[in-house]
Amino acid sequence: LKAKAQYNLNDWDSFVMIQTLVNTIYAKEAKLTKTLHAIDLLRGMGYKARFAEGEDKTPYLLISIKQQIYSKSFYDKDVSRFYIFAVDAHPRANYTQPIYFFNSPDDGMGRQLDMVMHKNPNIGKNDSPIKLSWDFDGKQYQMIVKANGELAALMDMYPQADYGIYMQSRSGMPLISEISSSLMVEIKKNNFSKEKAVAFVLRFSQKAFTYNTDFDAYGFEMPFFAEQTILLPYSDCEARTTPSLHLYIEIFGYDSVELHYPGHMPLAVA
């Protein structure tokens, strides 16, 4: 709990921290030992975690999660949905074999893990320079911002979840604020009207990042957080929607909503 407060960790960050911790401290121990220690630590932090075994006696860590996540097997048990994780594997790894629960007196205790990133974790530094270039109204623009590679690496461990979670999340906000400040400087320098300023930010969102579909670029469909969109070489319409939404809020204070059509996701601004 002290580390969670010190590093300003969200629930998911805390889960990854526990996974990393047990694999480091108990590196030479059996998978069963690591799994039991991870469950004990997660329960100590107030989360609803349980132990289970596969048919082949492989130990699994089960954690109850508040929101739905995808491409991940789960079991509904005692009015809670538990997603299956292996303590020594990437969090996105999926498991399909039948599992068997082991009951203990405190199985019903604890709270569900919240996947929304309500705050920006205090890890790493914004030290990866990224050049962003775009055109607007016949003129070329560019800015150099510094992204947090460690934060992006943490986000890369995030399982596929509903798009709304990415829209609600506040991770990566220092980078968004830096971009917002640079855009506002140009808006004031060019004395753009309100309508032209909105179009200017829209043009930035469309042209500052190289377009490609997730399937072509990465082999699977995956929403991204703002930091990932800016750091990764390619992004699609869904990935661009996340930083765009936060930019409109930061710069203009406008309400925004994503519109999810089959194969496309635009952003509506009020």
For the regions a protein language model found, what residue spans apply to each?
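Intrinsically disordered, low-complexity N-terminal segments that are enriched in acidic
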Residues: 1-135
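Secondary-structure boundary elements
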Residues: 1-19, 167-232
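Active-site neighborhood of thiol-dependent amide/isopeptide-bond enzymes
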Residues: 27-35, 213-268
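Extracytoplasmic/secreted proteins, especially bacterial periplasmic and envelope-associated proteins
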Residues: 36, 40, 196-200, 204, ...
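Sec-exported extracytoplasmic/periplasmic mature domains
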Residues: 42, 46, 206-210, 246-253
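Hydrophobic/aromatic-rich core segments of domains that either
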Residues: 49-77, 84, 186-192, 239-270
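Hydrophobic transmembrane alpha-helix bundles
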Residues: 87-98, 161-164, 248-260
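The feature marks a conserved, polyanion-engaging helical scaffold used by nucleic-acid processing enzymes
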Residues: 98-208
